[in-house]
UniProtKB/Swiss-Prot annotation:
A GO molecular-function descriptor: structural constituent of ribosome
Protein purpose: Binds to 23S rRNA. Forms part of two intersubunit bridges in the 70S ribosome.
Record's keyword annotation contains Zinc-finger: no
Family recorded in the similarity comment: Belongs to the universal ribosomal protein uL14 family.
Keywords: Ribonucleoprotein, Ribosomal protein, RNA-binding, rRNA-binding
HAMAP family according to UniProt: Ribosomal_uL14 (MF_01367)
Superkingdom of source: Bacteria
UniProt GO BP: translation
CDD domains: Ribosomal_uL14
Signal peptide range in chain numbering: none
Gene Ontology CC entries for this record: cytosolic large ribosomal subunit
Protein name: Large ribosomal subunit protein uL14
């Protein structure tokens, strides 16, 4: 469950290390985002010579949350930390690699590029 002011790890090699959610997209008063939702983030920490810089405002998709995600078959999955992947204006990932596992729910939301780059899909 991601809301405004939530800090997230970045799970790709775009150059950002930590981002902060500044808006949850999808509705005028939408408060929370879960796995597969698109948020607007501000880059708080970045590596030198990366594709994104500190202070950049970008869109990102949430790929891991500490709050469990309940599935239709009754199982649930949760992670230790919240993580996101930075997107460009076309909705494609900025980075060329994804670090750590991602959840199967991204497939239903048509993030196939992230699914194919991820080392593990849970």
């Amino acid at each position: 469950m991601i809301q405004m002011q939530t800090n997230l790890d970045v799970a790709d090699n775009s150059g950002a290390r930590r981002v902060q959610c500044i808006k949850v997209l999808g509705g005028s008063h939408r408060r929370y985002a879960s796995v597969g939702d698109i948020i607007v983030v501000s880059v708080k920490e970045a590596i030198p010579r990366g594709r994104v810089k500190k202070g950049d405002v970008r869109k990102a998709v949430v790929v891991r949350t500490a709050k469990e995600v309940k599935r239709e078959d009754g199982t649930s999955i949760r992670f230790d930390r919240n993580a996101a992947v930075i997107l460009n204006n076309q909705g494609e990932p900025v980075g060329t690699r994804i670090f750590g596992p991602v959840v199967r729910e991204l497939r239903a939301k048509n993030f196939m590029k992230i699914i194919s780059l991820a080392p593990e899909v849970l």
